[in-house]
Amino acid sequence: AAARKCFGTWKRKSDGAYYVNQEYNPRRWAVAAAAAKQLTKMGYELHTVEADAQNPYPLASNVPTANFPDGAGNIDPYHSYSDMFTGEGIIQTNKEFIWAMESSNVTNYTHHSFPVKFGGWGSMSVPQRVIDCYLMADGRTIHNSSAEYPYEPDFSRLTGESKKLGTYLLRENVPMMYANRSARFYASIGFPGRYWPMSSASTDASYVNQQFWYSHDDTNAGIAGAGNNVNDYSVSGYVPVKYIHPDDSWANGKGSVKGAFVTSPKPVSYTHLTLPT
């Protein structure tokens, strides 16, 4: 109804057909469902990355340890998701992608997530309501978290020691509200206290292995480090990192950026047909 009201009279130039149906036709949903089912039988499958025996990703206790697809015992949940977007995976051999293309715009988009001091523009922000949608490690929501993987809304309560989640490092003294979260959360969100390797800038130790806090007085990533433009910092304290490779560094002359390949707004993949985002 909203679409019909806003642009219901728009027509395709090639044949004059309306973009929005002028009459209600429930059959179209059946046609769409049949088409989606047909796609699921065309050889597409979820992208997986083999588990790293040297750096195993700790699975939640309720996750089956059988081999995929009966469990996640032989895959790395973090890299199975992250590698599709950071340029680490190869698009031509990825059976999850149904439609995608290479685009330098995505690489340039990551420029907004890096702080000014580290060569970025620092102004990208993710709202708290999106952060709250990410699940806990065992698949529960933050509103129904378990005693084993609790959600702690008190920002002042901090983690103790650092924790390795496969090759991903959750540093010590990070607010507990960011612990016990799903692999997708860590692959997608730059949160206060997140570890940024920026390994390609390794010739200058002051530009690698950083933690950004996004607080007012954080001279690296807060308003205190925004430089001449006070808008060049994350107002929410969260930045998107989904397309950022651990090696990436925008620091001028001190690193490089690996080409992330997926076009915006996001690709159509087998995941979108079979799983919630």
Predicted feature locations:
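Extended, leucine-rich alpha-helical cores of fungal transcription factors
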Residues: 1, 269-270
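Conserved small/polar residues in nucleotide/adenosyl-binding loops
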Residues: 271-277
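An aromatic- and glycine-enriched ligand-binding surface/loop that stacks and positions planar moieties
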Residues: 4-231
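Active-site beta-strand/loop architecture of penicillin-binding DD-peptidases
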Residues: 221-268
